[in-house]
Amino acid sequence: MFIAVEGIDGAGKTTLAKSLSSLLEKEGFRVFLTREPTDDIRNYEGDDVELFIKFTLDRYKHQKEIRKKLNEGFVVISDRYIRSSYAYEMKGAAAALGSEEKAKEWMDCVSNIITIRPDINILVQVDVQVGLDRISKRNGTITHFEQRERLNEALKIYNSFDWDIKVDGTDPLDKITNEVYLYLKNKIGL
């Protein structure tokens, strides 16, 4: 099973992914916890079209590792995956290509090389201000990905997707971890 945990910066994705991983391991599952972007590209900067292409290439390489772990019987949990690229690069791609519709069409085409798709997509929801407050407390600096306008745009795109489960990132961690675990248990018989 492949699970992607998505949401804006500061939503609590990493915290939830780690907590869910620990719970599943306690329940006897072998879990591979990963993240995107990988370390190979984490500090790359460029315009949104360049970033989408670079992140897709990074994901193309990453999916090989994911496929291997899935074939070995691991539950794979990814802190971000393909929907994050759409959320964060859509606005710039739309500006470059003339419309959001054209940008989505182009992004879909470029993303066709990504053949490993999550079985379960989880959205951790928080207000942009909550995300910004958490980012400031975490490291004190805001990157260009973490600007209010960019997070608002990302949140808009995230909300346009259908999700298997949405959780409130302001709820206690135990509550949202158990909520996701119960969903997985009921939905797919964990």
Swiss-Prot record:
The keyword Chaperone does not apply. GO terms for molecular function: ATP binding; dTMP kinase activity. GO terms for biological process: dTDP biosynthetic process; dTTP biosynthetic process; dUDP biosynthetic process. InterPro entries: P-loop_NTPase (IPR027417), Thymidylate_kin-like_dom (IPR039430), Thymidylate_kinase (IPR018094). It comes from the Archaea. Its EC number is 2.7.4.9. Signal peptide: none annotated. One of its GO terms (cellular component) is cytosol. Belongs to the thymidylate kinase family. This is Probable thymidylate kinase. The lineage of its organism: Archaea, Methanobacteriati, Thermoplasmatota, Thermoplasmata, Thermoplasmatales.
